[in-house]
From Swiss-Prot:
Residues that hold ATP according to the record: 109, 111-112, 132, 144-145, 195, 202, 281
Recorded name of the encoding gene: ydiU
A Pfam family recorded for this sequence: SelO
Function: Nucleotidyltransferase involved in the post-translational modification of proteins. It can catalyze the addition of adenosine monophosphate (AMP) or uridine monophosphate (UMP) to a protein, resulting in modifications known as AMPylation and UMPylation.
Protein name: Protein nucleotidyltransferase YdiU
This enzyme's EC code(s): 2.7.7.-, 2.7.7.108
Gene Ontology molecular-function annotations: AMPylase activity; ATP binding; magnesium ion binding
Entry-linked HAMAP family: YdiU_SelO
Organism: Burkholderia cenocepacia (strain HI2424)
Lineage: Bacteria, Pseudomonadati, Pseudomonadota, Betaproteobacteria, Burkholderiales
Catalytic residues (positions): 271 (proton acceptor)
Keywords: ATP-binding, Magnesium, Manganese, Metal-binding, Nucleotide-binding, Nucleotidyltransferase, Transferase
Entry cofactors: Mg(2+); Mn(2+)
Length: 522
């Protein structure tokens, strides 16, 4: 269905939007059957109101930007449609399992997320819409099924910020707030964020059917993912091994991009890993400020399992979990009669695929770091040069984002221009030593300083969603002032542009930012 962009038509759209979202032919995941999900209505928020709205996502879904101002919009995306959910359009929560902090957690599932259907995108793809905070489900365990305003604003802002950084991610259409109280570490208010993605299938979905010894359902799920998202795998000698390889390589690429911008996910459990290799489940995430390779963004991660430097290793480990779940399917087409022989070959084939993770991740990160350093030519010592910079940053706790952004000001021939970036380092002699190595490397490049600076500023964002910026927006939103949410969203749409009128948003964090803590208690 295509939506016009007039305000009048936007108003006409809303009464039928729930039915449109839930049209059976448009909900491929639902057609897999009851073993994969539970249908139930959302538990609507009381007196909902719009906190944030993404024009970009609306445009992607061919929705008029004016739709957010229409009566009924907040109600629909708070889980309360303008009329009862049609039987065929009832939202659903999916079931999955997974490893949490490295320990098998058993059955999990969408404990507070309800998928309300699909819409066609203007890019030719189809997108699922999911209400995070839509109420209790059979998979809520001890939870209340709610999300709170602070975490919903953070996810809304970061989903869109990551997209504009060029990093694969789920998107966010809107945040709906309410004065409805929710008990966490303190009394907060409830909210719902509407997530948008081609699919919300996770590694944990495969683990669930593997752990329950349901190879038939495991194969059904894998076929769905292959046919809809990885059609090239169908033509491979072993489609399920090809699926594992595709997901593994996408995951390696994704984490390389995280590392390159200093992004920490915070909760890289297998149930928080997308089979499409996109960033999903924004919880206690954070962008590194003062660089520490051991930075832990999640206050609940007392062991540092998901620290910045650990993310590549954990992503690789998670791919092993996915491989284990897919083992019953790998090699089926080879016609090996002996089950033990087939299983042994499946393990060997899976291990060969998993060995490709570091082979993919290393070069991907090297390419990203070479771009961040403004190096066009590939030289053997480039990775060592980048690592030496990170070590020097780590020792001085130099700001990650500002360091890389200001490197563009370094001149091949004039060390006096180093001051803006040099001043970020406590040990300036150590920086000088690195800068001399860098200048020597730049002498091998053909671009002049100006051309290199332009290229570097396209690789090094000036603006990222620092925790203190999100915190200011959240505090104002709690007072019903949503202007800072909108302002931040607009700034983060153009992370690589100078935007001199917003210079304060690119500054070093204030002292009070060091006391901010984010955890899993959203």
């Amino acid at each position: 269905m295509s939506f016009s962009r007039s305000a009048a038509d936007a108003a006409d759209t809303l009464p039928d939007l729930a039915a449109t979202l839930g049209a059976p032919a448009e909900r491929a995941f639902v057609t897999l059957g009851d073993a994969f999900h539970t249908r139930l209505p959302a538990a609507p928020l009381a007196a909902p109101y719009v906190v944030g709205f993404s024009d970009d996502v609306a445009q992607l879904l061919d929705l008029p930007p004016s739709i957010a101002a229409q009566p009924g919009f907040a109600e629909l995306f708070a889980g309360n449609p303008t009329r009862d959910w049609p039987a065929h359009a009832m939202p659903y929560a999916s079931v999955y399992s997974g490893h949490q902090f490295g320990v098998w957690a058993g059955q999990l599932g969408d404990g507070r997320a309800l998928t309300i259907g699909e819409l066609p995108g203007t890019d030719g793809r189809r997108y699922e819409l999911q209400l995070k905070g839509g109420g209790r489900t059979p998979y809520s365990r001890m939870g209340d099924g709610r999300a709170v305003l602070r975490s919903s604003i953070r996810e809304f802002l970061c989903s869109e910020a990551m997209h504009h950084l060029g990093i694969p991610t789920t998107r966010a259409l809107t945040v709906i707030g309410s004065d409805q109280p929710v008990v966490r570490e303190e009394i907060e208010t409830a909210a719902v964020v509407t997530r948008v993605s081609e699919s919300f299938v996770r590694f944990g979905h495969f683990e669930h059917f593997f752990s329950n010894d349901r190879p038939d359902l495991l194969r059904q799920l894998a076929d769905h993912v292959i046919d809809r998202f990885y059609p090239a795998c169908r033509d491979a000698d072993d489609p399920y091994l090809a699926l594992l390889e595709a997901a593994t390589l996408r995951t390696a690429d994704l984490v390389a991009q995280w590392q390159a911008v200093g992004f920490c996910h915070g909760v890289m459990n297998t149930d928080n890993m997308s089979i499409l290799g996109v960033t999903i489940d924004y919880g206690p995430f954070g962008f590194v400020d003062a660089f520490d390779a051991n930075h832990i963004c999640n206050h609940s991660d007392t062991s540092g399992r998901y620290a910045y430097r650990m993310q590549p290793r954990i992503a690789h480990w998670n791919c092993y979990c996915l491989a284990q779940a897919l083992l019953p399917l790998i090699g089926l087409q080879h016609g090996i009669a002996d089950d033990d022989a087939r299983a042994e070959r499946a393990v060997d084939d899976a291990q060969a695929v998993l060995a490709k993770f570091p082979e993919r991740f290393g070069p991907a990160l090297e390419r990203a770091m070479r771009a961040k350093l403004g190096l066009e030519l590939e030289r053997e010592g480039d990775a060592e040069l980048a690592n030496k910079l990170l070590e020097t940053m780590h020792a001085s706790h130099a700001d990650f984002t500002l360091t890389f952004r200001r490197l563009a000001q370094i001149s091949k021939h004039d060390a006096s221009r180093d001051a803006p970036v040099r001043d970020l380092f406590i040990d300036r002699e150590a920086f000088d030593a690195w800068a001399n190595l860098y200048r020597a490397r730049l002498s091998e490049e053909t671009r002049d300083d100006a051309a290199r600076a332009v290229a570097m500023n396209r690789a090094n964002p000036k603006y990222v969603l620092r925790n203190h910026l999100a915190e200011v927006a959240i505090r104002r939103a709690k007072e019903k002032d949503f202007s800072e949410v909108e302002r931040l969203a607009q700034i983060l749409r153009r992370p690589f542009d100078e935007q001199p009128e917003h210079e304060a948003y690119a500054a070093l964090p204030p002292d009070w930012a060091g006391s901010l803590e984010v955890s899993c208690s959203s």
